[in-house]
Amino acid sequence: MLHVAQEEARLDLLKQLKERLQSRLDKDKAAEVDTFAHLFYAAVPLEDLADRRLDDLYGATLSVWHFIQQFDPEAPKVRVLNPDFEEHGWQSTHTFIAVLHEDMPFLVDSVRVELNRRGMTVHAIHNAVLAVGRDDEHRLQRVASPEETDAPEARESLIAIEVDRHSNPAELEEIEASLLEVLREVRTAVSDFDPMRAQARAAIEELEATRPAQVDPADHREAIEFLQWLLQDNFTFLGYDEYEVREDQGRQRLDKVQNSELGVFRLDQPRYRERIRTDLGVEGDHYVPMPQLMSFAKSAHHARIHRPTYPDYISIDRYDDQGRVIGERRFLGMFTATVYNESPRNVPILRRKLQAVMDIAGFSPKGHNGKQLLQILEVYPRDDLFQIDIEELAQTALGILDIRERRRVRLFIREDTFGKFYSCLVFVPRDVFSTELRVRLQELLCEELDATFGDFNTYLSESVLARIQFILRFNGEKPVEYDIKRLEEKLVKLARNWRDDLLNASIEGFGEESANLLMSRFRDAFPASYREDFSARTAVYDLQHIGELDEGAPLALSLYRLIEEEGSGVNLKLFHRGAPIPLSDVLPMMENLGLRVIGERPYEVQASDASYWIHDFNLEHHTSVEMNLQEMRGPFIEAFQRIWAGEADNDAFNRLIIGANLDWREVAMLRAYARYLKQIRFGMSQDYIATTLGSHPEITRELVSLFELRFDPAERPGEGDIEECESRILTLLDEVPSLNDDQLLRRYMELIKATLRTNYYQRTEEGRYKDYLAFKLDPSQVSGIPKPCPAYEIFVCSPRVEGVHLRGGKVARGGLRWSDRHEDFRTEVLGLVKAQQVKNAVIVPMGAKGGFVCKRMPEGADREATQKEGIACYQIFIRALLDVTDNLVGGEVVPPRDVVRHDDNDPYLVVAADKGTATFSDIANEISTEYGHWLGDAFASGGANGYDHKKMAITAKGAWESVKRHFRGLGVNTQEDEFSVVGIGDMAGDVFGNGMLLSDKIRLVGAFNHLHIFVDPTPDAAASFAERQRLFDMPRSSWEDYNTELISEGGGIFPRSAKSITITPQMKKVFGIREDKLSPNELIRAMLVSKVDLVWNGGIGTYVKSSEETDAEVGDKANDALRIDGRELNCRVVGEGGNLGLTQRGRMEAAAKGVRVNTDFIDNAGGVNCSDHEVNIKILIDEVVSRGDLTEKQRNQLLADMTDEVSELVLLDNYRQTQALDLAELLSRQGIGPYRRFISELEAAGQIDRELEFLPSDEELLERTQHNQGMTLPELSVLISYAKSVLKGDLIASDVPDDPTIMRFVERVFPSMLAERYRDEMYEHRLKREIVATQVANDLVDYMGVVFVRRLMDSTGADRADIARAYVIARDSFQLPRLWEQIEALDNKVPSQVQYSMMLDLMRMLRRSTRWFLRQRTGMSTRDTIDYFAPRLAQLQENIGKRLRGEEQEQWSARRQELVKAGVPEALASTVAAAGSLYAALGIIQTARQTDEKPQRVAEIFYEVGARLELPWIIQQVTRLEVRDGWQAKARDTFRDDIDRQQLALTASVLGMDGGPRDSAERVDRWLSLHEGMHQRWRHLLEEVGSGSQGGFPLFAVAVRELVDLAESNSEA
């Protein structure tokens, strides 16, 4: 089939050529050339044709066609040229040779022989035999295939050859001339072939006619049969001539018989005569008749015809009738190939020689010796058999037989008959024979025999000996004298038995048994170059190193110094199995170790079962200092092996191994600190750091000593040892001249001191040191650490992976990212941990984040290989973190093994998934189990027995809470009202896919991911929802899978790789586009800035920045072409399901424009919150499992059963936090001052970095005040998170979490079924205090706002813990959670603004109540206080409207009616409307207790006094005071408290009045009449306040003073 296909391809090419011929030539000529082309190219390999351009094929065809047009068969034609397109019509990179000759044998072979003789590479040679017809002028008339015509046309051979290009014209002429000369020889030899055979027959006839008496009859008959045998195609005749014996002055001589020459002897007779003379030395010389009838000789000149071999002379004597020699016949030619394969016993003359030798030997042909001798003769060099005489043959053959398979060297030399050649037979043991030995033997023989090498052939059989025949030409006129025994001894020495020496050395080194086993593998393994360079004893040592190699140890080393070496030079041998080691792999390692490679010699050791390489390097230190071999050998070899194995990095730090006398692990430690310096943006390169350490070796060693003193568990540093070491370093630093060097070395010392723990001294179970390093650091001790500064940090470093884990506190949590930012992954993680810190405000742990990079990702790795390496690096990273983390066993802290700790107990380490590690939780938990970590599979949430965030849709649902709240504020119910959306992502994604299924009212008009753009200008909400659901349910999907039939008119799915996209009218309308075509990136930008209701980010990347930010500052190059500015956003709402979709400044800019947007860490906090719930739940139930009350299977089922409730708990946190943000936004518009002060105070305390968080300056905030602007939601998102984090931290440090009443907050994080079964266990939870603190902080900030605690701290002087306790008391005393839930239940039933107004009413009441409890100091416990006040407050709340008086009652009624009209239930409206008055109930209850009255009675008097003195009105005026600073705010709060206090004092006074009416109103009237003077003064003051003539704080200070006087007037009365 292949042949058919190739032939079809050839025909196709010729068809194309034919078409080209027809298009350019006339019809007849085109047909002729086409016929020729088919004949000429018939045998050309297809690949040679296919490589040709059609133009060149056409040109070459015509060129050769023209070449054969004129040809005289008597004159061979040769053309040599370099084809040039302009000159010849075709092009080739080679020199082209065309040969045209009358067809005959040997043409192609002889041309090739000549070209090879000239050293020319033949790239192509094609031969076509053509049947041609020519006219009398030798012009071509027709051409045909010889097989296709019976006409008697001449046969011509056309040869086309391509050889290496030769540009010199003279050289081209020389090639042409030499080929013509060869062709003449061929022509002459072939034309005389039959005449030469006739001469052979004539010789036979002549021999048969005469038989000289002196010739043995058998020899005579043998000569005749030999000539007959020659004529049986066993000899190729090349030349013939005859000689006759003449008498010349009494001496005989040979003279050529004129005109007897045939074949090549007819050509250039003088040259050939000289050639014959030099070959045979006969013509014209003194002739001495030979005893034999026939003789043989070799020509000393290579044949130029047929084969490049030395042709043979066969000389036959001629006799007269008297038996005298009268002349010679001489034939020149070559035995055909069959002769060399034929048994000599079948060849006349040779068979008699063989029989004669057997007779001389006297061995029986059937005996062992006879058979052996016959075999020797059978394989004896055939040419020698013809030329050697019987006696010499017998002597040589018997000498060979005498070797008898012994491993020895023997030499046999034969001189040819005419004294021109030596034929040397050398026998050597086969196992030592090699080309290299053959060359050395040849050189020795040439030197000893004064000869020139001619040829060789090798004979190998099953014998233990190899036979090499050397044909050597005499340099002189005659052979030199030689002693064959001495010469043989030299050959023996040359082929010296180095292997025997190896055996002896092996026996000495390993013992005889082991040595024999070793020799069975390595006897023939070492190459000649190795044997020349090294002794056998050295080889034994090298074999020891080779023996160290195996799968686990692919490299062995030997570091040594030659005896002859001096100074800094050393030698290194590398031993490697399999392939040689590329120099490019080794040289960088040498250089980084501080060594220069002076020379290298590789040796391949070919054992019987494997191949090994020895690389011997000559080295010197780069500083040329003398190296102490004994000191450096061990550390150097181990370091090299570790670097080779990839367990140590190959960089400039390795120079410290020799330069500072360190081992590889000490260098790894210093390198790891340098890597950390790079990550914290220390401004020195790694090479500079390495060079500096190397320049100060003493300081470097002291730094290593300091590290050892601090962390080596085997060290027991005495008192002051560490300080002494530090002192030595500082003393040495004083002598460092370079400021940069000094700074670097001091930073190293600082880093070592800032290190708290390390796994440097930990070993694996196999006893090996771990091949990665982990340092736990206190970053606050590191100068210039980039902000924000984490509380703790673990840096991991190895040749394979680097990573960092940053924590905001001891209990901290966050994901681990597979980063691709090798240069600054810590910067990336630091940015993420900053976001995580604020995101984690709602959960127990502080923010944490980790990231790692894979440093040795396989080049060109596919997805599977990439993932495999990523997992391996992740596993190393996890192990490193656990290596330096405490454990809890039986409730007791257990430090990690072989770790010296310079910090307190620290057992809490929890991780989570992040970019690139979404599926790695089970892997982390397996390692957690492997380490026996107390958290088990709570170590990494979301694993096989954890909560699957995608299945729960928890992140999307959490973000959707933000979306719903934003839209509720805009009067849109996302679950009932349709709204338009532009999305970032695709339905296969967690956040995007789940998010776009959270409402069937979504009209997704456009979306994009990294591959496609989806556009549906006027979608059907229900149908598109169902289609999105279908895509989401697919195992894998993309926008391409969307059913395009469901896409509305003008829409479509477009690849982002498209050059441009046509914009339809519908697209123009929905996205506000004017252009007819846009690039994909331009269309995406148009989608992002379009006027849609929602932009939903569920993808990866940053798409919105501030107009004041550059793309480079954003750090997301992939999306630079898409990114818009925040001010360009025209959507109403942004939902940030994904991270980093907008920069913080981009959010602020969008929010300032009116876009409703929080931040990513607010919107997508559901994921971390869910994970925190999982961890806390697992910690609880794992304790139950550990004591046997729950099986593992039951535990996992319980986790699954609680999924929905966990989701509800998480979403409730999202709901309330976004509610808190909206409330904070409203409050900031009412007065931004408290927020400004809050930021400033946090900043002053070092708890926030305003610049890092992009918070506005004081000046900007004051400017907003002037424009009645508040804080934006993105800014408040940051502040609310800090408010919670700071409060949480203070609460953990206080006794608040231990308060039995407040401790009940622990139950809030657990599903109800856990509370039902394991309530007691909740109060024993290991993180109980942290949970309580977190829940209290969340509750307080969610309902009381960002600045609540700060304001109370300022106004009361209380700390955060006391404020939180007072808040809980006030909250529960008023049973506010019930009211909050009722208000929250009104979502989509009343406007959000109404809900928020109610929340703010309760917030103000609760703030004052909290302050009241802070000041009263009841002396009761939290529980007792709540139990005392709660029921009394409940009583006072009943029918409170009836108790109010005057304007206060009117205000209550109006507010109640307003709320009821808005849709608020009457009961709730009544309670909330009274919020401003309810606060007073606390004082009323306290007064009732003091006066021993019932609270209801006290309340009646209280409200009556207030109404009569218009105290609610005066409090309103105080509240309306504008405050410009904190002092005025404190004063305002003081005025209100004082008025409340005085109202209670007046109430008590009225109640304590002796006598008087019972009715409240009458009793108050009576009391006022008794104090008429003071009363009138107060009334006058009210008039002044009401007139507004005198305002501000001084007036109210006077008013409060007057009220105090009125209250105190009772005593005077």
UniProtKB/Swiss-Prot annotation:
One of its GO terms (biological process) is glutamate catabolic process. Transmembrane segments: none annotated. Keywords: NAD, Oxidoreductase. Its EC number is 1.4.1.2. It holds the Pfam family Bac_GDH_CD. It is an enzyme of class 1 (oxidoreductase). One of its GO terms (molecular function) is glutamate dehydrogenase (NAD+) activity. Signal peptide: none annotated. The active site is at residue 849. It catalyses: L-glutamate + NAD(+) + H2O = 2-oxoglutarate + NH4(+) + NADH + H(+). Belongs to the Glu/Leu/Phe/Val dehydrogenases family. Involved in arginine catabolism by converting L-glutamate, into 2-oxoglutarate, which is then channeled into the tricarboxylic acid cycle. This is NAD-specific glutamate dehydrogenase. It comes from Halomonas elongata (strain ATCC 33173 / DSM 2581 / NBRC 15536 / NCIMB 2198 / 1H9).
